[in-house]
Design a protein with these regions (language model features):
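A short helix-loop-beta-strand connector motif used in the catalytic cores of GNAT acetyltransferases and
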Residues: 38-50, 54-60, 65-71, 186-191, ...
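Conserved acyl-donor/pantetheine-binding loop and adjacent beta-alpha core of acyl/acetyltransferases
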Residues: 57-96
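Conserved acetyl-CoA-binding loop-helix of GNAT-fold acetyltransferases
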Residues: 88, 93-114, 138
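Conserved GNAT acetyl-CoA-binding A-motif
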Residues: 112-127
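Conserved active-site alpha-helix within GNAT-family acetyltransferase domains
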Residues: 127-146
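C-terminal "cap" of GNAT-fold acetyltransferases
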Residues: 149-173, 199-207
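Disulfide-braced loops of extracellular cysteine-rich modules
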Residues: 178-186
Length: 207
């Protein structure tokens, strides 16, 4: 007896309207996406991309935003990284939604690089989304800072395009925030990750 299988149901990517993004944010608790007026400015000055099911149900979304935008998060990043070197660049705000964002982050990272045209690309992650760090490191980002942004809890700040030095890394458990912060303060960046005993460890390199 020959069994037939349905073709795999692929997820689609498309740019979202303000209404679609705001609807998805109704279940989002991150203070990065507050107040509502800030979210509307994000959609106006940047691009919001969504991951959709074949039924067109919206599963996840992520904004791609210019560094020079009149946004609280952009201003906090400029203060964190310094304006020189990131002018004209773009950054990824945290993804939202219940869907695994791997496909979405790959697409938005590529879009940010395209828009930046050789200038700096950054990304921000909420402290509660630490499980996504290996995903970003796999997309060529490096963890460069762990600090508050716009009165938020300490956020992960990542930059793209950091070359991996030819030396052995210092492995730091992600859960040890004090040790991680000390390594970052000494000029190290996390460029690699691995799992040990169900924990995430970051490979830190001097950059």
């Amino acid at each position: 007896m020959i069994q037939t299988c349905d073709p795999p149901r692929t997820l689609g990517l498309r740019r979202l309207s303000a209404q679609e993004f705001c609807t998805l944010l109704q279940k989002e608790t991150s203070s990065i996406y507050r107040p509502h007026s800030e979210v509307l400015r994000m959609v106006t000055v940047g691009e919001v991309w969504g991951l959709c099911a074949p039924s067109r149900q919206l599963l996840a979304a992520q904004p791609v935003l210019p560094m020079d935008a009149d946004l609280a998060l952009a201003a906090a990043l400029r203060a964190c990284r310094g304006w020189r070197g990131i002018e004209g660049g773009y950054f990824l705000a945290p993804p939202v939604g219940a869907q695994d964002p791997a496909q979405l982050v790959a697409a938005t990272a590529a879009r940010a690089r395209q828009l930046a045209r050789g200038r700096q690309v950054l990304a921000v992650l909420d402290p509660g989304a630490q499980q996504l760090l290996p995903l970003y490191l796999g997309q060529g980002f490096a963890l460069r800072a762990l600090r508050p942004l716009d009165s938020l809890a300490p956020c992960f700040v990542l930059t793209a395009g950091t070359a991996t030095p030819r030396r052995e890394p210092v492995w730091v458990p992600l859960e040890d925030r004090m040790l991680l912060a000390r390594q970052l303060a000494k000029g190290y960046a996390a460029l690699d990750s691995r799992r040990r005993d169900q924990s995430i460890w970051l490979g830190m390199y001097p950059v």
